[in-house]
Swiss-Prot record:
Keywords: ATP-binding, Ligase, Magnesium, Metal-binding, Nucleotide-binding, Tricarboxylic acid cycle. This is Succinate--CoA ligase [ADP-forming] subunit beta. Its EC number is 6.2.1.5. Binds 1 Mg(2+) ion per subunit. Pfam families: ATP-grasp_2, Ligase_CoA. Heterotetramer of two alpha and two beta subunits. GO terms for biological process: succinyl-CoA metabolic process; tricarboxylic acid cycle. Its cofactor is Mg(2+). Residues 9-244 form the ATP-grasp domain. Coiled coil: none annotated. The lineage of its organism: Bacteria, Bacillati, Bacillota, Bacilli, Bacillales. It comes from Exiguobacterium sibiricum (strain DSM 17290 / CCUG 55495 / CIP 109462 / JCM 13490 / 255-15).
């Protein structure tokens, strides 16, 4: 789960991470009022969307007067901002962050992530902070410095100092930098984050260290432990189908293809998408119905798949372990009848009560194509949608 920058900064502020003073605004009038409450000659008006690259796309403006704040707020609110992370459709700006400007001396990058290779938390830093960090990582990866944290002891002060010196943080500001990194790490662990990124982290001419931007991503599986984070969720920034899926306890991610997939188990779902691609098909979604699917849940899954107008066929791939194939078959039949399915439907069943499940599909009288294996099913659905 993602949150907006202004929400991320308030969360970090509560842990003692220094951030600029700022106020969220949902209207032009609120933006002007916010600017009046803030200090300093420069105000920064920042578009709030769940995507990076806002600066390059024109979503961050420096205002030197109240008139410019009003002008920029009017320009940004309601605008569709297209960045390298939004895709060509972009995202509509519905809120702004108005913030006090600061005299930047140097920009850095600081990020904390879970590393799949080491299975540990890794803290990354670079002296090349700012808008082009992705290009830096690709062109000169040696400029990204990493510190792996031992989970048994947590982040050690010497690791943060080592990072500071490698990044070229001024000696007089190293202690402040170490304090920020330590607090950010504590937040990361306490709140079950998967990403905590500050880009840029800046040193100022006044001798401060500030988180000028903040990106936080939280592990959705741990949200039940963090009601304060859940309260910050902005569903308007998410795919409506993914929001609907979460309400029905379905794991759904929309893709760009035309073959809808209904599978039980995340690993099998990924393998299903791979084998569809192998047979020159294009999956329209990742959809894991989990191990406890009911007829009602399968029906909701079908509705979800069919809400994508690009879908030209559906491949159901079930391996019944905890889940029983006859229950899934009943759900498929009920769902097909309820939604009036007219698209090609290929079903592959294996596992518990598989014979009973296949008989239910056969006796339904519906135009369901049976598959003997995952490869057979993928090949059949790829051919049917062409």
């Amino acid at each position: 789960m993602n949150v907006h920058e202004y929400q991320a900064k308030e969360l970090l502020r509560s842990y003692g991470v220094p951030v600029p003073n700022g106020i969220a605004a949902f209207t032009v009038e609120e933006a002007v009022d916010a600017a009046e409450q803030l200090s300093g000659p420069i105000k920064v008006v920042k578009a709030q969307i769940h995507a990076g690259g806002r600066g390059k796309a024109g979503g961050v403006k420096l205002a030197k007067s109240q008139e410019e704040v009003k002008e920029f707020a009017t320009e940004l609110l309601g605008k569709t901002l297209v960045t390298h992370q939004t895709g060509p459709e972009g995202k509509v700006i519905q809120r702004l962050l108005v913030e006090e400007g600061c005299a930047i001396d140097k920009e850095y990058y600081l990020g904390i992530v879970l590393d799949r290779v080491t299975g540990r938390v890794v803290i990354m830093g670079s002296s090349e902070g700012g808008m082009d960090i992705e290009e830096v990582a690709e062109a000169t990866p040696e400029k990204i410095i990493k510190e792996v944290v031992d989970p048994a002891v947590g982040l050690q002060a010497f690791q943060a100092r080592k990072l500071a010196f490698a990044m070229g943080v001024p000696v007089k500001l190293v202690n402040k930098f170490v304090g920020m990194v330590t607090k950010l790490y504590t937040f990361f662990v306490d709140k079950d984050c998967s990403i905590a990124e500050i880009n840029p982290l800046v040193t100022t001419k006044d001798g401060d260290v500030l988180a000028l931007d903040a990106k936080l991503n939280f592990d959705s599986n741990a949200l039940y432990r963090h009601a304060d984070v859940v309260a910050l969720r902005d569903e308007t920034e998410e795919d409506p189908r993914e929001v609907e899926a979460s309400k029905n306890d379905l794991n759904y991610i929309a893709l760009d293809g035309n073959i809808g997939c209904l599978v039980n188990g995340a690993g099998l779902a990924m393998a299903t998408m791979d084998i569809i691609k192998h047979f020159s098909g294009d999956p329209a979604n990742f959809l894991d119905v989990g191990g406890g699917a009911t007829k009602e849940k399968v029906t909701e899954a079908f509705k979800l798949i069919l809400s994508d107008e690009n879908v030209k066929g559906i491949f159901v791939n079930i391996f019944g372990g905890i889940m029983k194939c006859d229950v899934i078959a009943e759900g498929i039949v009920a769902a097909t009848k309820e939604v009036g399915l007219e698209l090609p439907l290929v079903v592959r069943l294996e596992g518990t009560n598989v014979d009973a499940g296949k008989q239910i599909l056969k006796d339904s009288g519906l135009a369901i194509t049976a598959a003997t294996s995952m490869a057979d099913g993928a090949e059949k659905i790829a051919a049917l949608v062409k």
